[in-house]
Each structure stands twice: as C-alpha cells, then as structure tokens.
Swiss-Prot record:
This is Iron multicopper oxidase fer1. Iron transport multicopper oxidase, which is required for Fe(2+) high affinity uptake. May be required to oxidize Fe(2+) and release it from the transporter. Essential component of copper-dependent iron transport. The chain crosses the membrane at residues 592-612. One of its GO terms (biological process) is cellular response to iron ion starvation. InterPro entries: Cu-oxidase-like_N, Cu-oxidase_2nd, Cu-oxidase_C, Cu-oxidase_fam, Cu_oxidase_CS, Cu_oxidase_Cu_BS, Cupredoxin, CuRO_2_Fet3-like. Its cofactor is Cu cation. Its EC number is 1.-.-.-. Binds 4 Cu cations per monomer. It is found in: Cell membrane. PANTHER family: IRON TRANSPORT MULTICOPPER OXIDASE FET3 (PTHR11709:SF361), MULTI-COPPER OXIDASE (PTHR11709). GO terms for cellular component: high-affinity iron permease complex. Belongs to the multicopper oxidase family. It comes from the Eukaryota.
Length: 629
C-alpha cells in the first residue's frame, strides 16, 4: 500500500519555509491560454464502425487537453464556428468559480449561449476576479459543452490540475495518465433526441442506446507542456507500463448515458482521489464510474521475468439501457503493454463474476471536513411520467424543468429583494433560494427504475447517507443515518440507485446561481434539473463585476439581462416563457366524458347498423322464398 505523506505541525522555521514556498509559487504561476474554435470535424471514426462528423476544436478531435498546475491562471477563449445558427458554451465540470459564476458555462443559468461567430473568454482557474483566499482546486476534472446536447457529439476533454505546493502533494508516483471512457453514437444527438427520445412514439422514455463504448488515453504528466493523447481507441489503444514503476491513472466517464465498470487484469488498484478530493488509499477490485464521475488510482507495474501484456477493462453497465441491441459490445478493453513483451502475448484476464454494490461512502478525504448539522433541508423526489402531450418527462417534486429566458444569475443580481422569492426564476425552474453560509442538506429520493448521477455546479458536497432501497427493512441495503460521521466523503457527482436515496450537504459559501441536474444527457433534456439560488442578497453588480461583453451577447440575441425569467419586474408575469408539460388528468375530465360519450354513440350506431342490416337481410330472404313459390 502506498501511504499518504503524513504531516505534523511545523516549527517556526518550517512555517517560514512554507511562506517562502508560497511566495515562490505565486512568482512561478503561469497564465495558460487556449483558443478554441468550436467547429464540426468530418469523418471521425473512433469505434471503427462508422465515420461521422463531430464537434471538435480547431479542426480536430478529440479537443485539446487542459493540463495545468494549481497556481496557474487558465483562460479559454471559445469561438462559435459551428455555422449552424446554434449557440455554444463550455462548462468546466467541478470548478467552483468563486465570485465568477458567469464563467460556469451553464446556458440559461449563468450565461446566454455564445452566438454564432462570436467569442467568450472563460477564466476557469484562479481568475483575478476571484478573492485571494479562494479554495485551491487540484485533481481530475473535465470540460464539456453545456448547450444543445453538444458534448455528446464530441465537445468534451480532460482538465487535469496538478498540485504545485509541497503541502498539497499527498502521493508520489512515476507517471500520470488519464483514461477517458465514453459512449459513442453514430447520429447527431439532437436528431436522436428529437426523433427517438422526446417523441410520442416513445411514451416510456427509453433513452437512445449508444453504438459503442470507447476507451482512450492521454499522457498528463505534471510537465504541463507534455500533455498528449495516445494513439488509438479501445482495442487499438495501448497504455505503456515499465516494470516496477507506479502510475497514477485518472479515470473519467464522459458519456451521455453509459456507466462503466473499470478494472485491470493482473494489477491492483488503490483509489487516491475522487473528483478533486484526495482520499486515503483504498484498495478496490473495480470502479463503478457513472456519467461525469472521476477517480484516480495508483497502479504499480509488474516486474515479471517473463514479461507479457495485460488487458484494461471498461464494461458498460447494461442496467442503463432499456434494451441491449444484439450488435452492442458491452465489454470494452484496451492493452497495458510492457517492454520486451511479445505483442500477442497476454496474461490471464480478470473475470468479475458479478458487480457488487460500489459504496462511495467508503472513501475518506485526506483533508478532513467535519459533518455539520444542516440549517436547511430540501427534499427532491425523482420521477418520470408520460405527460398530456404523450411524451415522457422527468421531474423533481412533480415539476419538470424548463429553462428561464433570462439567465438565473442575472435575475438574482438585478431583482433586489425580490431575488429571494423563488417564483421570479420561472414556474418550472425548480429554483431553491438558500441563505449565505448556511449548511444545506439535499435529500434525493429516486422513485425511478433507473440509476441517476446528479451533479451540483459550484460546489463539492458531502455524501452523508445512501440507501439502495428506501423501502427495505434490511439495514445492509437501507442503513440508518450515521450521525457520528466525522469526515464524510466529498465529491461533485453522486449516483443514486433505483428506489434508493442520497443525502448531500454543502456550505452555501459561494453566492451565485448553481445548476443541479442529472448528468445523463437525455434526462436533462427531459427536465431532471433544478437551480440553487445562493445568497441572492449578496449578489449585485459590484459583487460579480460581469464583463460587459457577456451581457452584450445576450442582448444581441434579444435576451434581457435584468428582471425575472422573462425580463419583467414581476413575481407572476411570465408571458412568453415556454410552458412546462402537464400531467394526464385522472377521473371524469371533460375530455374523458367526451371520449366516453363518443364511444357510446359509436357503439349505438354500430348496433343500429347491425339491426337494420339484419332486418333488410330478413326481408330479402322472405322475398326470395315468395319467388320460389
């Protein structure tokens, strides 16, 4: 086992050295800038089955890797070159954006979409507009589109942040690789949603099933200029190991729907990081990686006298699919290669007879944060239903999310005292107003038959409780709440099992408007989302200092930047806002009575037709008998 580096209280000399080190880090911090022309790239074929056009950057795919140090300032200028009349955006998943929520990238929450031909500069790490005492971030993240299903069509990439302060380096390893997992579709996802998912022909809400699963690798050492993708995908991809070396593997699931079980043949894994939170080393046989989740594991390479290669596995969780097509390869693998091992010589494959429940409460953060009694509790009940228009929608507390026209952040900063009234954000925004610095508990109850990974923007949360089945009397699958926890697991994306629950806690110390949603893309499309309006009494133009071009882009598209969800100074007038779906009414509604009456009339007409036909037929028979006589 590789132990974390333990640290004791430093004497005065150590404190002086630490202060000098911090000054040196500040002096050595770099400004990393990338320019992304977001455009369509033709004939991309990573699964070898079908070439298609995808959304890439600067004419290539996959998009660039962001590989930086924790003290760096990162700016990404995104230019919308899609040439389809559709807006774009980028969300840096897992970043906090303290006092810079307008860089979060969630369309209709923190910004308007980037108009065609225009640019938006995101300061994703250590923005000068953030306070000097902001919380440092390091670990494994990713950046992806947050508009119009565009990340499913390819606009997604790793974000790796390396610690550069010795006090933050808890583990030693020889090299660093990122393992990217993802599902892959052969059609534009917007078309799939329109034609196959949000459609009367799909009243049960069966999600579009991918054509393939992908594995590909990136070399992401802390020599930041060296970040590169390794060649090949899945069975054509190779991860190079050298005997005796220890590697950090950062596993990211960038799928729209698929979850993966990740494991290695012939090698042991120890989890050391979960979504930007270093944890005490925890041996695992496999990882259960839901959409948007990330883990880092340490793996020590073998030192065999007779070297051979080994398989790296990422098996798709078939429970995520309503129907598994016969031609879908669920079990995806790549190669761990060793020098001097014959190319076709492999060690025995590891076989998992079953996938046992993967408990993310088992991980213990290195930097402890105590569990604190919540000041406010919000319960969210997850459900899916066929609505009155014949389509299947998702909902929190029977409200299916409909985005506001005015970004919620701009409503919160412009509506004064009314900003604390959740009604102003729209009747279907699922807005929850939370007070500054309170401890918030979110209780999720999943009444759906499927698993759901939920992501909160702008925060880590503590996962303080999980149940696999809230109706069970078995404490092993429905345990009582453990009130004696001292350092609960923290992350930003949690999987809630079908029929199960999860309790999350976070400190409302980051004023802004933060999206909370299921990260399965079709479920977000169908309305499984809400907004946390955090400390609106703190927000103002002077607090945020929104760059003028951001609001100018809204106004150029005819979108207001002040007022309620439609730009009015009202808590009830939402004229022009798209209306949410309505539930099918039960009982004797007007339509039901009309339909029943129509059925009765149709039945009576049918009966009358039979009687009249029989009467005429009888007369004809009598006439024929008279003629025979």
């Amino acid at each position: 086992m590789v132990a974390p580096q333990r640290r004791t209280v430093m004497p005065a000399l150590g404190l002086l050295a630490s202060s000098l080190c911090s000054l040196l880090l500040t002096a050595n911090a770099a400004t990393v800038e990338q320019h992304w022309n977001i455009n369509w790239v033709p004939d991309v074929n990573p699964d070898g089955l079908y070439p298609r056009h995808v959304i890439g950057v600067n004419g290539s795919w996959p998009p660039p890797i962001i590989n930086v140090n924790a003290s760096d300032t990162v700016r990404i200028t995104a230019t919308n070159k899609l040439e389809t009349g559709v807006g774009a955006s980028l969300h840096s998943h897992g970043m906090f954006f303290n006092r810079t929520g307008y860089y979060d990238g969630a369309v209709a929450i923190t910004q308007c979409p980037i108009p065609p031909g225009q640019s938006f500069t995101y300061e994703t790490l250590n923005s000068p507009a953030s306070p000097a005492d902001r919380r440092k971030q390091m670990g494994t993240f990713w950046i992806h589109a947050h508009n119009n299903d565009q990340y499913t069509d390819g606009l997604r990439s790793p974000v790796i942040i390396h610690p550069d302060d010795p006090a933050d380096i808890h583990y030693n390893y020889d090299d660093d690789y990122t393992v990217i997992l993802g599902d892959w579709y052969h059609s534009n996802y917007t078309d799939l949603v329109k034609n196959e998912f949000m459609n009367r022909k799909n009243p049960t809400g069966a999600e579009p099933v991918p054509k393939s699963g992908l594995i590909y690798f990136a070399h992401t050492s802390n020599k930041t200029s060296a970040a590169t993708y390794l060649p090949g995908f899945s069975e054509n991809a190779t991860l190079p190991f050298e005997a005796g070396k220890t590697y950090r593997l950062r596993v990211i699931n960038m799928s729209a729907l698929a979850a993966f079980y990740f494991y290695l043949s012939g090698h042991d894994m120890q989890v050391i990081e979960v979504e930007g939170v270093d944890v005490l080393p925890q041996p695992v046989d496999f990882l259960s990686v839901a959409v948007a989740q990330r883990f880092s594991v340490l793996v020590t390479a073998r030192n065999d006298t007779d070297p051979q290669n080994w398989k790296l596995h990422a098996n798709m969780d078939e429970d995520m699919f309503d129907v598994v097509p016969e031609d879908l390869q669920l079990n995806v693998s790549a190669t761990i290669s060793y020098p001097n091992a014959p190319k076709d010589k492999f060690g025995p494959e590891k076989i998992l007879e079953e996938y046992t429940y993967f408990d993310d409460l088992q991980f213990v953060p290195v930097n402890a944060e105590p569990m604190v009694t919540p000041d406010a509790v919000h319960r969210l009940d997850v459900s899916f239903d066929t609505m009155s228009d014949g389509e299947n929608y998702a909902a929190f507390n029977n409200i299916s999310y409909v985005a506001p026209q005015v970004p919620a952040l701009f409503s919160a900063e412009s509506m004064g005292a009314l900003a604390s009234n959740p009604a102003i954000y729209g009747p279907n925004s699922n807005a929850f107003v939370i007070k500054h610095n309170e401890m918030i508990e979110v209780q999720l109850f999943n009444w759906d038959a499927g698993k759901h990974p939920f992501h909160l923007h702008g925060h880590h949360f503590q996962v303080v409780h999980k149940s696999q089945d809230v109706t069970s009397d078995d404490p092993t699958i429905n345990p009582p709440f453990n009130s004696s926890q001292v350092n609960p697991m923290r992350r930003d994306t949690v999987m809630v099992p079908p029929g199960g629950s999860a309790y999350l806690r976070f400190r409302a110390d980051n004023p802004g408007a933060w999206f909370f949603h299921c990260h399965i893309d079709p479920h977000l499309v169908s309305g499984l989302a809400s907004i946390f309006i955090e400390a609106p009494d703190v927000l103002s133009d002077s607090f945020l200092n929104v760059p003028s071009y951001i609001k100018n882009q809204c106004q150029a598209q005819g979108i207001a930047t002040t007022g309620n969800a439609v730009g009015l100074n009202s808590t009830s007038d939402f004229d022009g806002l798209a209306k949410g779906p309505t539930y099918l009414e039960s009982g004797w509604t007007g339509r039901a009575i009309a339909a029943f009456t129509g059925c009765i009339i149709t039945g009576l007409l049918g009966l009358a037709t039979v009687v009249v036909y029989g009467w005429h037929s009888g007369e004809e028979d009598d006439d024929e008998e008279e003629e025979d006589k």
